[in-house]
Amino acid sequence: MKFVKIDSSSVDMKKYKLQNNVRRSIKSSSMNYANVAIMTDADHDGLGSIYPSLLGFFSNWPELFEQGRIRFVKTPVIIAQVGKKQEWFYTVAEYESAKDALPKHSIRYIKGLGSLEKSEYREMIQNPVYDVVKLPENWKELFEMLMGDNADLRKEWMSQ
């Protein structure tokens, strides 16, 4: 799906906007799915790629956030193996606090989703662990400050 912001008043752009306006053509109440799940690598690059998706959803369907329908699928950073049993850890700190209780285990650092075996990826898809994206109470003011027309508000915020 592609999100395009069009501010031009040309005839071609108006036609494009009418034909491709995602917001007008899709209502959150008529979506075929209960939730939107975003899955990326658990490293900084993967987490950084989430923001454009969030912005697209937020600027078109803020009600999905209010309803708790935007979620991150947590992906493991470390998989500890004891025999055939696996334990997944979603942060290094989580692993560090549990490692002493795991006897004779091996670990595997997951560099990205491509590091998962097919069975692990299937498990993650079939039994996802979610983080629900929650908005602060003043989200409308924050969004207006960060994305609105008043650059002075952003400059003031960034200088704090």
UniProtKB/Swiss-Prot annotation:
Cofactor(s) listed: Mg(2+)
Coiled-coil segments on the chain, per record: none
EC assignment: 5.6.2.2
Nucleotide-binding keyword on record: yes
Domain of life: Viruses
Role description: Small subunit of the DNA topoisomerase that untwists superhelical DNA. Controls topological states of double-stranded DNA by transient breakage and subsequent rejoining of DNA strands.
General remark: There is a 50-nucleotide untranslated region in the coding sequence of gene 60. The ribosome apparently skips this region while reading the mRNA.
Quaternary state and interactors: Part of the DNA topoisomerase complex made of gp39, gp52 and gp60.
Protein name, entry field: DNA topoisomerase small subunit
Organism listed in the record: Enterobacteria phage T4 (Bacteriophage T4)
